[in-house]
């Protein structure tokens, strides 16, 4: 018996994903007239979405009810275009609609980071860097990442996880100035993993734990948002060096598509660059978050 059927039921996942994507669109977003009529529920009607996708209302209704059996790639592409899905959302829709094909190709496996990758991380001394895997598990890091975010080596392996740190460690709210965005990103990554590995027991357990312990996680999980890890800017606060504005890049590792290398850097000659230099000189004693509570 599955402990968390909501995560593993691909039909329910497909239904909710399509419904939430449809609800976020208004007629004017897709060039349809609205005529000022009041809508009992937000977003496009099913018949409007079916019209945009070029399928019958009955067919789309069956799909939104979770019946994706034998749906063609062309139809999924048309629905993705009608829903204005991002590339990440389009890929997620395909995985949800064709879970049997996915099951044949993927099975959740034990995560290991190659020793050479840790050696590479150790050689990176001027910017924080770490490797993250499925479920937002933190697999390896360098000394400056430990000084910035916390010495994850002091945590139990199961707790070296961004989702647990973000939602269960209150110090993360002090470190991430825009904590809400960080939390939303993390949940969207977990949603992507759930689409790729719907039968991963560790992912199911993680989602179940966070759903019980965090109301904020439950609310974000219900949005069904999905995003790929990418690049951007993070505003952080460190108790010793103050505010930091750091750009980050995510590099997908070629021999394991589930693992990514993340590196943070500051603008040259900025206050943030000076802050990183101070952290590098102080080392792990400067840890801010992610270490066990004292």
Role assignments for model-derived ranges:
Residues 19-26, 94, 98, 122, ...:
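Amphipathic, well-packed alpha-helical segments that form the structural scaffold of globular domains
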Residues 2-19, 71-77, 81-112:
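Short amphipathic recognition helices of helix-turn-helix/homeodomain-type DNA-binding modules
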Residues 1-44:
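A short, Lys/Arg-rich alpha-helix, primarily the initiator
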Residues 115-294:
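Hydrophobic protein-protein interaction segments
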Residues 29-43, 102-118, 122-123:
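An N-terminal domain-cap segment
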Residues 35-40, 46-47, 53-70, 80:
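Recognition helix of helix-turn-helix/homeodomain-like DNA-binding domains
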């Amino acid at each position: 018996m599955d402990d968390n059927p909501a995560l593993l039921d691909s039909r329910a996942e497909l239904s909710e994903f399509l419904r939430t994507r449809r609800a976020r669109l208004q007629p004017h977003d897709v060039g349809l007239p609205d005529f000022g009529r009041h809508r009992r529920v937000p977003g496009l009607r099913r018949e409007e979405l079916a019209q945009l996708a070029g399928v019958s209302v009955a067919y789309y209704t069956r799909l939104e009810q979770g019946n994706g059996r034998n749906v063609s790639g062309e139809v999924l592409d048309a629905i993705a275009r009608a829903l204005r899905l991002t590339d990440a959302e389009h890929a997620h829709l395909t995985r949800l609609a064709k879970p049997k094909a996915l099951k044949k190709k993927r099975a959740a496996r034990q995560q290991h980071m190659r020793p050479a990758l840790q050696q590479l991380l150790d050689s990176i001394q001027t910017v924080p860097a770490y490797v993250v895997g499925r479920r937002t598990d933190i697999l390896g890091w360098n000394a400056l990442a430990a000084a910035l975010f916390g010495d994850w080596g002091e945590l139990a392996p199961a707790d070296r996880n961004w989702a647990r740190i973000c939602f269960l460690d209150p110090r993360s709210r002090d470190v991430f100035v825009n904590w809400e965005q960080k939390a939303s990103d993390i949940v969207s990554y977990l949603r992507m993993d759930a689409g790729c590995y719907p039968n991963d027991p560790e992912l199911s357990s993680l989602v179940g734990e966070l759903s019980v312990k965090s109301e904020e996680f439950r609310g974000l999980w219900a949005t069904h948002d999905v995003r790929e890890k990418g690049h951007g800017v993070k505003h952080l606060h460190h108790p010793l060096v103050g505010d930091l504005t750091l750009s980050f890049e995510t590099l997908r590792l070629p021999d394991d598509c589930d693992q990514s290398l993340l590196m943070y850097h500051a603008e040259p000659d900025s206050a943030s660059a000076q802050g990183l230099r101070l952290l590098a000189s102080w080392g792990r004693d400067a840890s801010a978050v992610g270490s066990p509570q004292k």
